Amino acid sequence: MIYGKNNMKKLFTLLLLPLAVFPRVLAQSIAPFQKGDRVTFVGNSITDGGHYHSYIWLYYMTHFPGMRLWMANCGVGGDTAKEILARFDDDVLSKNPTVLTFTFGMNDTGYYEYNNADSAAFARQKLQEARERFALCEEKLKSLKGIRMVMIGTSPYDQTSTFNDNIFAHKNDNMQRVIALQEEAAKRNGWEFLDLNKPMVALNMKQQESDPAYTLIGSDRIHPDNDGHMAIAYLFLQAQGMKGKKVADMQLDAASGKVTRAENCRISKVKKTADGLQFDCLAASLPFPLDTVPHGWGFNNGAAKVTKVIPTFIDDLSDEHLTVTGLSGNLELSIDGIVIDTLSSATLSTGINLSRYRHTPQYQQALTVMALNETRWEVERRFREWAWVNYDFMMPAGFLNDNSEQAARKFRELCKGNDWLASKRGTYDQMVRPEVREAYEKEMDLLVDHIYELNQPKQHTFLLRKL
């Protein structure tokens, strides 16, 4: 849904999502990012330890290689709206964002109390707390100038999977009431709004029809695995109008040796050969790569598993289409001398999506970008672990950004009886030093610089040879 004051032109783009995948869920719209945007993703542990923001940036790195922008993870584990507001100036505004996404609600609504006898009263209490705390956040956000606000309704708590019986009944129902508060605020203030909850519930329950123990939301019912985060990225990018944008659309007629369509690419040196067709193509984008390896603490699934719940994912967000008519028989397709596949003329005349072939030179280039972006994510995680220590423990104790010996003594004191905090001793000892933080920031900047050097598409030679 669009609530931005200047977005009326986009109203006509609202479409009903495919009912088989997202039943009873209306498509929503967010303005695409622009060159030079600085985007901060504000949230709790789902943002903090998750990948959705990294995957969104990876899409922009590969699909818009000439449009450099910057994104930052501003999540802190365990935060409610109250803690987000407390760290907001130091953690978020200090990054000078031009776009700010804001999500909360998982921690605000409570947990085990939903299984107590007075769960209804507890739910009302937590909703009222969330309303009051979010109202303060709303006033803060309203006071900011020059920042585009995007309210994001949180990913769900999985209260339907049967993989165990440890379920906080109706917790997600209360989370949806919190999301309604965000939607109302978006309407009041002309902010953009995207609900992740209902579409992800729909995706989850679709799989649970055949496998009741399935969960997209993670083994703790709270934190989506990598495939769940890629589903979040899909919903976000879909809302930005990226679904259906071509990596390249190459259409040629081999009989005439002519290009019939070239979308988001430039085709040249078309040459009919005795047994097929040869041409060069320079695409404006790279494929959107899907990682098959799990990343992040406690995660078990690679992002590529998103295709189980969104089978059209690759065609929707990474369509590098090749269509060639006027051929007969079976043909070998090679790119830069690398054999890609043997294809029938009928298949080629219908068209193929080259993004489904991970060994093409252009997909391999995209995988390099992905690997560098993952390295950047890992460095950024050090800052988010430090943020948890700094804002949730040191700041309340009066030692925000304090690298004095007195602060170190307070940290050691706070670690007593808190095993989670004690496990971050190494993080504290490193990140409390501004020189160390500066070095890691330079490392991330270097990685991003390198990404925007290596993500530039290259011209490739395509050869179709009859077998």
Regions found by a protein language model. Give the residues of each.
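Bacterial Sec-dependent N-terminal signal peptides
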Residues: 1-30
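Alpha-helical cap/lid subdomain in secreted, periplasmic
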Residues: 8, 33, 54-70, 79, ...
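Membrane/wall-proximal cationic-aromatic binding patches
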Residues: 28-39
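Catalytic nucleophile-elbow at a beta strand-turn-alpha helix junction centered on a G-D-S/GDSL motif
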Residues: 37-51, 77-80
